[in-house]
From Swiss-Prot:
Disulfide bonds: none
Keyword Oxidoreductase carried by entry: yes
Catalytic activity as recorded in UniProt: 13,14-dihydro-15-oxo-prostaglandin E1 + NADP(+) = 15-oxoprostaglandin E1 + NADPH + H(+); 13,14-dihydro-15-oxo-prostaglandin E2 + NADP(+) = 15-oxoprostaglandin E2 + NADPH + H(+); 13,14-dihydro-15-oxo-prostaglandin F1alpha + NADP(+) = 15-oxoprostaglandin F1alpha + NADPH + H(+); 13,14-dihydro-15-oxo-PGF2alpha + NADP(+) = 15-oxoprostaglandin F2alpha + NADPH + H(+)
Species the sequence originates in: Rattus norvegicus (Rat)
SUPFAM superfamilies, A to Z: GroES-like (SSF50129), NAD(P)-binding Rossmann-fold domains (SSF51735)
SUBUNIT field: Monomer or homodimer.
The protein, known as: Prostaglandin reductase 1
GO MF entry, a single one: 13-lipoxin reductase activity
Amino acid sequence: MVQAKTWTLKKHFEGFPTDSNFELRTTELPPLNNGEVLLEALFLSVDPYMRVAAKKLKEGDSMMGEQVARVVESKNSAFPTGTIVVALLGWTSHSISDGNGLRKLPAEWPDKLPLSLALGTVGMPGLTAYFGLLDICGLKGGETVLVNAAAGAVGSVVGQIAKLKGCKVVGTAGSDEKVAYLKKLGFDVAFNYKTVKSLEEALRTASPDGYDCYFDNVGGEFSNTVILQMKTFGRIAICGAISQYNRTGPCPPGPSPEVIIYQQLRMEGFIVTRWQGEVRQKALTDLMNWVSEGKIRYHEYITEGFEKMPAAFMGMLKGDNLGKTIVKA
């Protein structure tokens, strides 16, 4: 019998998550029925959205999330033993599936690319960057793009796609190490928002003419400052609001309606699951090719050990990571 370890939400978050919010449980999995497979987690993802999505869980539920898993036993001919899949299986070491919701890695996945990239640059974060920039912002060559949390899993891909499309890219991050990384990736301007005397002045210096596109991962006062510097007909893709996720008090006021009206700005929130089928497959192929060709670079922040899932999650929310946070089971 296989023992499955699962991290559950012991208590709903109040403010910043702590170890006491999580509980590790062990259950014995039953034998497989016909049509089922037994999966073993290889790599698991922790992402900012989980902080918000956990509100919908009941206490005692498994934490949600994607993982790269291997089929270790199969009674389903579509998924023979050894098949590598990506699926929303949550924070669990082993699971049983009837095959629904399991996505095989593309047959053309290059041997030189780590499997964990299917949770990062060639997975949900990469797709988020791709569609947010190209569809929501409707990016055009020659425009100026601003992205915050730019050294993270999504932001780092946003900046590199924008450069591929012939744009000027300004990125902000929360440490000098991250700023150096952004410059290595080819960002035109990058600065540490925590150490500049004035965010408003730093943004204006980076692009005196303002910004055509703003890819927002942070929200809050940061975004209120940016919106004042958007060009007429500017577009804003609202991907996340990590500055607000752990607040216990009221949120700060939003941006000035007058600015949005008279600058004729377009703001749109989005969730990447909107794009499915052929468009999603094309995006994954584009991302995979760009990475294989060295046009998009990546960095993974890997924590070893399934037992460290909560620590990796909390570290990611604090900004400890450079690039995509991954747990190797």
